[in-house]
């Protein structure tokens, strides 16, 4: 008798109502016996460790070693064959097969307990390792216990939960059912650990800055608003930690970084979630060119340590992070991907506006030349930046926190880097001229008054901090979720966030 699910997804035995009723009755019996949810079983191994250590050994070698293990996990399949059964146990490391025989257990346990347990129940078992005739590493159970009664059945297709909406709304089912999802989030955890290791190795100090702020700053985005009852003031979930981190550099912490959540009250898309993870770092006595070297080194290190190779495959694209990234200015990128564009046409407001409008861009009368150039770049070039590429020379108009370029103050010493047609990060030499910063904040405030919801607020305290002296500094932000999409071959941000934002169910 087999208890996996049929191909059409319907349980083989009872309909759902009867299934739930049956499981509740079984739990009621366990409660009466006083053993409903025991908590005294301890395991000494997990499945992947056992496969790694003993998977290549023969049955004769395992018999000679006489290895007894205690493992625990969720029963995913069971095949009852009279006086003996095979079951699959799934734990954090993967799966391992159990062999359960009536005569190896206390009298009555096999028929009265084990055979009545359900798929999805969490079991603890102890027994010796052996190999079946087909060579599968298994545990010959001498003790087996029910640790948690599952009140609901496994997803219809335990080999892979097919419904995308269910995967995101009930991530726990996705993690039970899909090996690929479990692996994605394991890799995410390793990447996060390796980023922190890299930063520590480069003498950065990890810090935490406020998630609720009285003035949101550090990015052009619409914030979430909340209210602090005790203080009687509105506050904002942060859109970026930048201005607080630079205050720390003013205070003497010369290399700082933070990995944490940002919140932006914007739309949902395969690349956007309103709550997302960013890393920002700031290093004194450095400029944007030092950040370019740091980014290339970080990606090379991450891919080697986590994936074992600097070559990454994502869909039909391949990236080699062992090589330097391509570099080009924003104007060069526009002219490269829209060859009919003359460079000098981008330097004139009228001709640049005509180019933008020919691309279907609705130019707002409040925009300056820098904003128009940036919109044209995003429309013509951004999606074509497949191989790792730094785009430099962003206009000051769209870079209110970046240092102006010494040779041409229309531009800033800033870059964004793109991989697979996606912006992954943004870095620049920091503006440390308090008067220039105050003037740019004033421009942003005017834009906000004119209806630009994403323009920055004027942060007077930050200007005061700059007046105390910010050393020459470079700062970088990397979108961790987009990085995870890249390194785990995922095609939507929902696949790399455990609990993504979703529209309410109707």
Curated annotation (Swiss-Prot):
- Protein location: Cytoplasm
Q: Where does it sit, as one GO cellular component term?
A: cytosol
- Catalytic reaction list: tRNA(Lys) + L-lysine + ATP = L-lysyl-tRNA(Lys) + AMP + diphosphate
Which InterPro entries does the record cross-reference, listed alphabetically?
Aa-tRNA-synt_II (IPR004364), aa-tRNA-synth_II (IPR006195), aa-tRNA-synth_II/BPL/LPL (IPR045864), Lys-tRNA-ligase_II (IPR002313), Lys-tRNA-ligase_II_bac/euk (IPR034762), Lys-tRNA-ligase_II_N (IPR044136), Lys-tRNA-synth_II_C (IPR018149), NA-bd_OB-fold (IPR012340)
Q: Would the keyword Cytoplasm turn up in this protein's UniProt record?
A: yes
This entry's Enzyme Commission designation comes to: 6.1.1.6
What is the free-text note on the cofactor? Answer: Binds 3 Mg(2+) ions per subunit.
Name what cofactor the protein needs.
Answer: Mg(2+)
CDD domains attached to this UniProt entry: LysRS_core, LysRS_N
Q: Which residues bind Mg(2+) 1 per the record?
A: 416, 423
Q: Which domain of life is it from?
A: Bacteria
Q: Which SUPFAM superfamilies match?
A: Class II aaRS and biotin synthetases (SSF55681), Nucleic acid-binding proteins (SSF50249)
Report whether Plastid shows up as a keyword of the record.
Answer: no
The molecular function GO annotations come to: ATP binding; lysine-tRNA ligase activity; magnesium ion binding; tRNA binding
| EC category | ligase
Keyword field: Aminoacyl-tRNA synthetase, ATP-binding, Cytoplasm, Ligase, Magnesium, Metal-binding, Nucleotide-binding, Protein biosynthesis
**What family is this?**
Belongs to the class-II aminoacyl-tRNA synthetase family.
Q: How does it assemble?
A: Homodimer.
Q: What is this protein called?
A: Lysine--tRNA ligase
The species is Sodalis glossinidius (strain morsitans)
